[in-house]
Amino acid sequence: MVGKGIGLLVILAIAVGITPAFALTELERTSINDPQLVNAFGTPLGNSINVDQQIQISADVMNNQEKSQKIAYLVQVKDEAGFVVSVGWVVGVELNPHQEFKQSISWIPKESGKFTAEIFVWEGFPINHNALSDYTSIQISVS
């Protein structure tokens, strides 16, 4: 009986020994930094733009893991009432461990108003998708 207890203790000690104390949660695998509106050349535009002005909804995506990660960068734009007026995505980007990559989606507003762009980073899109980080948002004023 003592032998089984010691064996279990050894297995438990090995399992605890290889589990990192700093393991990332599912939503910490990537981070979304510096969300902004930019023109086609990457010049920041601020949050006030014009109707029919083509912009890029941009952010830096950081892979916080010790392994490579394929991502999908998704942006949905909502109007003041919360209705989605635009959805765009880029798939197939692979980030190396701790790599940061600037990604963007183009949008041309067709009417004036207040909008919110929500930026998501997922894996497995469009099938079996999982969030890799919390989403972030940008407020946009169109005149």
Predicted regions: what they are:
Residues 1-27, 59, 75:
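Secretory targeting signatures
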Residues 24-51, 143:
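Short, compositionally biased P/S/T/A/G/V-rich stretches that sit at domain boundaries
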Residues 56-64:
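Short edge beta-strand/loop segments characteristic of extracellular beta-sandwich folds
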Residues 63-67, 81, 111, 125:
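Short, acidic/polar linear motifs in exposed loop/turn regions
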Residues 71, 76, 111-142:
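Terminal connector regions
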Residues 82-90, 128-129:
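Surface-exposed loop/edge segments in extracytoplasmic proteins
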Residues 92-101:
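Short proline/glycine- and polar residue-rich coil/turn motifs
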Residues 103-111:
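Short, hydrophobic beta-strand segments
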